[in-house]
Regions:
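Conserved helix/coil segment N-terminal to the catalytic DExD/H
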Residues: 178-209, 220-221, 225-229, 395
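Conserved helicase ATPase core of P-loop NTP-dependent helicases/translocases
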Residues: 158, 172-183, 351-352, 362-397
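Conserved interdomain hinge at the start of the Helicase C-terminal
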Residues: 304-345, 352-355
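Conserved segment of the helicase C-terminal RecA-like domain
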Residues: 426-455
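Post-DEXD/H (motif II) to motif III coupling segment of the RecA-like Helicase ATP-binding lobe
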Residues: 217-284, 461
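A short beta-strand element within the Helicase C-terminal
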Residues: 400-413, 422, 438-441
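Walker A/P-loop
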Residues: 119-143
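Conserved SF2 helicase motif VI
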Residues: 126, 247, 415-435
């Protein structure tokens, strides 16, 4: 048996034990098939040829190919047999350039960075507000090799580059984003959407360290999954790291994140290191339930009596009396001098709430997907100019760092655990003279679905991650 470790792991003349390991661990139930099956859409499954399983390994002739991150998973097979192991690069050792660190790290950050560097890869799980970006930057600094930092939003890209340049101004950091491809001497920060659509072969051997910010997206929405996996499969970097606060999914696709980035040192599909939330210096938000007492309109139900989630969101978003309850509470918080963020599921709901707040004399800012980058940066960097930001869950959950925020209004019943936890984390940042952070959760108590989702949110907020 011969194993070559490059952009992927290539195993020639593989054993039955290795094949069994791949079949067991790298065959994942297709979440799309699972959803359609659950709601009785067998005809769609057949018509669209949707497979029940997704395999993240392949066999061609006598060669078994695995994602690079599976190395620790198959290490026991490498040790147990006489194997010809080949690395297609000559340098797999850490070579710090002796650039002194300029970051005053907390003890929990030092421990996390040390563990990740010694592991030479894997997933770091660290709570919102714990300084994941700082940890990623210091991992790169400790290894001292050319890096590629992958992110999926323009906000995260700009924030990361600004943070790196402020800490290490002597580094030549390139950018790969829409309308700009500049390969820096020391590394690059790249938007995954851009990098996935250029010829990666031109510089695939240039980078030796990859850091995937918010790496849960490696196993998230299908479009992003394909982009991340194409890049990770193409670049033979010896050090691949992932950063996330919420390594959870309701299905088994999370295994793909570990397979492509790195299993733990004991070969399990779990984080390489997990920061204890009790060690993190943040302010813990209170969680207050606001009862919404209105009766349900049964027209939002499906014919079988079940809820249609999107009809439900439309219904409660357009309920003016319900909105007035939320607006009254926002005004009360404004009189207390709070810095608030109001989250809605629908852009139209955001626009309605923003307009109503302005009519009440509240200094409100609307930040949605179509908000231009320059305007968004102005809002996020000037909290003294506003009382309230109105935005969507999707936009706030990643890439927003306004330490002054202390109040969160959950206007609609968000059901995704990761989204809720990340949004709560946005108001728990430490800031001088900050008020006690508080989450207002508006719950339609006469709609059983909404009450159940509130209980789930409360449990997830209490546990954090």
């Amino acid at each position: 048996m011969e194993i070559t470790i490059s952009n992927k792991i290539y195993i020639k003349d593989f054993s039955n034990d290795l094949l069994n390991w791949a079949e067991k661990n790298l065959t994942i139930v297709n979440p799309k098939w699972q959803t359609l099956k659950r709601i009785g859409k067998e005809e769609t499954i057949i018509r669209c040829h949707i497979p029940e399983y997704i395999k993240i390994y392949s066999i061609k002739g006598k060669t078994l190919t695995l994602p690079f991150g599976c190395l620790y998973g198959i290490w026991k097979f490498i040790k147990s047999e006489k194997i010809d192991l080949k690395l297609n690069d000559s340098d797999y050792e850490i070579s710090n350039k002796n650039i002194p660190t300029r970051i005053e790290l907390y003890d929990y950050q030092k421990e996390a960075i040390n563990n990740m560097v010694l592991s030479k890869g894997g997933v770091l799980v660290s709570p919102c507000g714990s300084g994941k970006t700082v940890c990623g930057i210091e991992i790169i600094h400790s290894i001292g090799k050319r890096f590629l930092w992958l992110t999926h939003t323009g906000d995260l890209l700009r924030q990361t580059r600004s943070r790196m340049k402020s800490l290490y101004p002597e580094l030549d950091i390139g950018l790969i984003t829409e309308g700009e491809i500049h390969i820096g001497k020391d590394g690059c920060i790249a938007a995954v959407q851009t990098l996935a659509n250029v010829d990666i072969d031109e510089f695939k051997d240039y980078f030796e360290v990859i850091v995937v910010d918010e790496c849960a997206h490696v196993s998230g929405a299908p479009t992003l999954v394909k982009m991340f996996q194409k890049i990770l499969d193409s670049i033979p970097a010896r050090y691949k790291y992932g950063l996330t606060a919420t390594p959870t999914r309701s299905d088994t696709m999370i295994k793909a994140m570990y397979a492509y980035i790195g299993l733990s040192k004991n070969g399990e599909f779990e984080p390489t290191y997990k920061v204890n939330k009790d060690n993190v210096k943040t302010m813990v938000a209170l969680h207050e339930k606001i009862d919404i007492p209105f009766d349900i309109d049964f027209s939002i139900l499906n014919s079988d009596g079940t809820f249609d989630y999107y009809n439900l969101i439309n219904y409660i978003s357009n309920n003016s009396k319900r909105n007035d309850i939320i607006l009254d509470n926002i005004c009360k918080c404004q009189q207390e001098g709070r810095k608030q963020v109001v989250l809605c599921q629908l852009v139209s709901h955001c626009e309605t709430m923003h307009k109503k707040l302005l009519e009440r004399g509240i200094k409100s800012e609307l930040v949605i997907g179509k908000t231009k980058n320059k305007e968004r940066e102005r809002v996020l960097n000037s909290p003294e100019e506003w009382d309230v930001i109105v935005s969507t869950y999707k936009l706030l959950k990643e890439g927003v760092d306004v330490k002054a925020l202390d109040t969160l209004h959950l206007c609609t019943p968000q059901k995704d655990k990761a989204t809720v936890v990340q949004c709560v984390g946005r108001i728990e940042r430490l800031c001088e003279n900050k008020k006690q952070p508080i989450v207002y959760d508006y719950v339609d108590i006469k709609i059983p679905y909404c009450e159940r989702k509130y209980i789930e949110r409360k449990r997830n907020i209490d546990k954090r991650y």
